[in-house]
Amino acid sequence: MKKSARPYICTFIIALCTSCSVSKFIPEDKYLLDEVRIVSETKEVKPSLFNSYIRQNPNAKWFNLVKIPMRTYCVSGVDSTKWINRFFRKIGDAPVIYDESVALKSQEEIEKAVRNMGYMGATVHLDKKTKKNKLKLAYRIHAGHPYRVRHVVYDIDDLVISDYMRQDSAQSLLAPGMLFDVNVLDTERQRITKLLQNKGYYKFNKDFLVYQADTARNTYLVDLTLRLLPYQRRKEDLPRKHRQYKVGEVNFLADDEIMSVQEGTLEEFDSLRYKGYSMYYKGKAFLRPQVLVDFNRIRPGELYSEQDVQNTYSNLGRLRALKYSNIRFREVNGENGTQLDAYVFLAKNKNKSMAFEVEGTNSAGDLGAAASVSFQHRNVFKGSETFMMKVRGAYEAITGLGVASQDYVNDNYMEYGIESSLNFPQFMFPFLSSNFKKKIRATSEVGLKFTSQVRPEFSRTLASASWSYKWTDRKRMQHRLDLVDVNYVYMPRKSSAFQEYLDSMSLRNSALKASYENQLVVRTGYSFTYNSAGNAMMRTPTKNSYSIRANIEEAGNLLYVASKLVHPNPKDGEDYVLANIPFAQYVKADFDFAKNFMIDPRNSFVFHIGVGVAYPYGNSKMLPFEKRYFSGGANSVRGWSVRSLGPGVYKGSEDGRMDFINQAGDIKLDLNIEYRTHLFWKLNGAAFVDAGNIWTIRDDSGQEGGLFKFNEFYKQIAVAYGLGIRFDLDYLILRFDGGMKAINPVETGKKRYPVIRPRFSRDFAFHFAVGYPF
């Protein structure tokens, strides 16, 4: 079957790569637009700045090399009534036929854009080169001599506004010697407008700021004047001075029925007065007044500030009890002049919801089922606190227990658990001032979880409790503080056969035995994420960007001190315990950096480095299994399946049993480069090269060759290469990656370099994941 398919595959590839079939779609006396370039004679005028002005681009190339979409389209025949031809045309890309009128419009827009940069005499010429029925087009920019600002004069006939601008002059974008750049001039108008709107000038906009430019004779110098126009609502109105507004009354309208009423009819509804604010509602208020006051930034008696309005929107958007909010202002005459009364309309969200999930499971051929039901309340204490509870149960029929099955109480796997969390929309901690809680945009969460697992070999109970905080700042940084996170593992039962197996494996696999012991982990951690493109972790950025993620955590130090005080001298070889439970003690740090280079709107290049180090000490000789690093998988070195690489040159056990336990380490290094390209429709492609491995800090007989050594670790770095397909569904990205081993540090000689003689069955690994790897 495979042999018979080869001729068809070869024929299709040849059809895609040959160009003769393109000509039948090119009309007579027309040309295929083969290439478009922008060329600039001036170093300061970068061609990449004008890509957005190109109205007609050539057919897209996969990986910037081959026009596969166009070739696919050209495989179709001329007869569009045949379904096969329609299919190829639908998935392909029709040849782009050069249009002179469109090119002239692009030429005009590029020329205008260059002149707006300060090159007033700039010209753009079209350079066309034809060969047979193909055309290559170049937009050649002749920028000429730039115009620069000689003097800057401010004509501001308003002492208050003039004083505000003088105080903020250090932030001004205007300065003698600058290019006469129209874009910068407009940005300065927007900056001043934003400044004044935050100083009470509610009706101010940038159109009240105009420039006057005078060019000195026979020079490339410009004398610039920035003038303030008086306020004039309509042409027929008399000009007047710009009015500065203060906030009068602030009213919260917390009911769906009030959303559609006029301000003058609010007396029909229930109301209360709280700390100078008015609340209107019908029946019972669904939010406490204190919550609304804390999340509001619009203060009575203060100057109007657009920034305060936006901050209020942002704060209210964090309240899950609200569907949406709307803020309106009404101009009124107060005792101290013109004021703005604020009306904050609040639409109530649905408080309660339930969800039920059923899933099938297949663990190494053992079939089972799982079900869960969850409940959520978004406004438990009328402060937009979110309570969640989830109950889960699972069952799996286990086969292949072998001769030891007579020692087992059953041949099934059962799991049941319950988890709950309570989320507060503020930083909840005793002794903190209310001002601090208002400034930091944080959420607090308390969580509890209990899980019971019953297998033929053992029974295990897992319990956890956590108290954490999350907050963001305006610098695109997200923070998380795990104040305390307690995890307890209890093994009430082990079958005699399973215990004998663990004892027999303890010498060559100490990590395996440690994974089935009672254990207590009490940790504290902090992590942050910064993304220069904003909250764009899932989507492809539209410009060069980078992201940084870092994490640090420690566990067991307080318990160690407490245990030392209670039992200062334990017996030799024994660990410190709390209530007869040994606890873990370690410190762990991770750093992750990714840089995205945009080549053009369809192609980008991404570089990533990830480093992690964890050190067990004191009461622990080994990290808890869930805190150890592993390599291989969809987000690591993709030529290896998950948890199948390392540590170091560790080859695994002879029988391969429980290798995933041993293939974990204390140090991790990941290096990745990835070329991403848009293919067609919602499909994107990627070509990647990955490198990395994991290592242990201490030598372990069960992980031979896994110890980290400065003079050897670089020789143990594994390398993989591969291709990937990404299906962009807008709300999520489905990723399919196929990796091949290039350098396998475990092997020696020629086998160490499978890239030279690849074998698909030995070197290939397939991965499915959601979202980008970095």
Each model region followed by its residue ranges:
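Bacterial N-terminal signal peptides that target proteins for export
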Residues: 1-9
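Gram-negative/organellar outer-membrane beta-barrel architecture
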Residues: 164, 285-286, 305-549, 638-639, ...
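C-terminal motif of bacterial Sec signal peptides marking the signal peptidase cleavage site
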Residues: 17-19
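A generic beta-sheet turn/junction motif
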Residues: 132, 554, 600, 727-731
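Interaction-mediating elements
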Residues: 2, 21-318, 327, 339, ...
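C-terminal outer-membrane beta-barrel translocator/porin domains of Gram-negative envelope proteins
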Residues: 265-268, 277, 361-364, 480-677, ...
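Flexible glycine-/small-residue-rich
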Residues: 40, 141-145, 156-158, 226-232, ...
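Outer-membrane beta-barrel domain signature, especially the mid-to-C-terminal portions
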Residues: 561, 658-660, 700-718, 749-759, ...
